[in-house]
Regions:
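Conserved glycine-rich Rossmann-like NAD(P)H-binding loop of the short-chain dehydrogenase/reductase
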Residues: 14-28
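SDR active-site lid
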Residues: 159-218
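Active-site helix of classical SDR
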Residues: 106, 142
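Substrate-binding pocket helix/loop in short-chain dehydrogenase/reductase
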Residues: 82-83, 87-92
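Residue(s) in the substrate-gating loop at a strand-loop-helix junction
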Residues: 126
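Canonical Rossmann dinucleotide-binding motif of NAD(H)/NADP(H)-dependent dehydrogenases/reductases
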Residues: 1-17
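The beta1-alpha1 cofactor-binding region of Rossmann-like NAD(H)/NADP(H)-dependent oxidoreductases
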Residues: 23-24, 44-56, 88
């Protein structure tokens, strides 16, 4: 979904900073954007590390030569398993990326948007934010947290002309399974679901979201 957003933003004339814990993946995205004639930069960033995200916020303005006006918090990982079989290390790993990563992103950019006088934040959650699929406890909790955070910030920051929205897509083919820690039996089920029951694509999600943002419907 992150790459799809970057490509769609480039199509609309946007300059993009692609931040990823996997720098090579970010650089691949930047190459695609540059082929479209877009101004794009790649940065290594572990969203679970607040210092990394603060550095991203400061450096992005320098790279772009203008303030950042849109932030998309998209990093996420998956983990399935029975609640009593998941370790606290598992919980910390998922929470640090899926929830704290979004908190860090918002915390780094909201003060800048207040100073600028406007801005937009799109947090990517999941339908798991409001459904309770069994054996997905840690994932469900993190996505519910992203939903709650986003709705709270939307109400709190509206008076500052800062728009905060949250996406809760259903099944969308992404790399979350490949990059997650999902036991084999769950991985096969997830792959089957994505292959056979995916209701949309990451490109469609990005296009629809940005269309609505451009029309002032978010």
């Amino acid at each position: 979904i992150g790459r799809s957003f970057a490509i769609e933003l480039a199509k609309r004339g946007g300059s993009v900073v692609c931040a990823d814990i996997n720098l090579e993946a970010a650089e691949e995205t930047v190459t695609l954007l540059e082929q479209q004639g877009a101004k794009a930069f790649a940065m290594h960033c572990d969203v679970g590390n607040p210092e990394h995200v603060t550095h991203l916020a400061e450096t992005a303005e320098i790279l772009l030569s203008h303030p950042v006006t849109l932030v998309i918090n998209n990093a996420g990982v998956g983990l399935g398993g029975k609640f009593d079989e998941l370790s606290l290390e598992d919980w910390n790993w998922v929470m640090n990326i899926n929830l704290w990563g979004v908190i860090h992103g918002c915390h780094a950019f909201v003060p800048k948007f207040k100073q600028l006088g406007y801005g937009a934040i799109i947090n990517v959650a999941s339908a798991a934010s409001y459904t309770a699929a069994p054996e997905m406890s840690v994932y469900n909790v993190t996505k519910a947290g992203v939903l709650a955070l986003s709705e709270t910030l939307s109400a709190e920051l509206r008076k500052f002309n800062i728009k905060v929205n949250v996406l809760c897509p259903t099944l969308v083919p992404t790399n979350i399974i490949k990059n997650g820690r999902i036991p084999g039996r769950y991985s096969k089920l997830a792959d089957h679901a994505l292959m056979n029951y995916a209701m949309t694509t990451s490109d469609a999600v990005a296009t629809l979201t940005l269309n609505r943002l451009d029309r002032g419907q978010l």
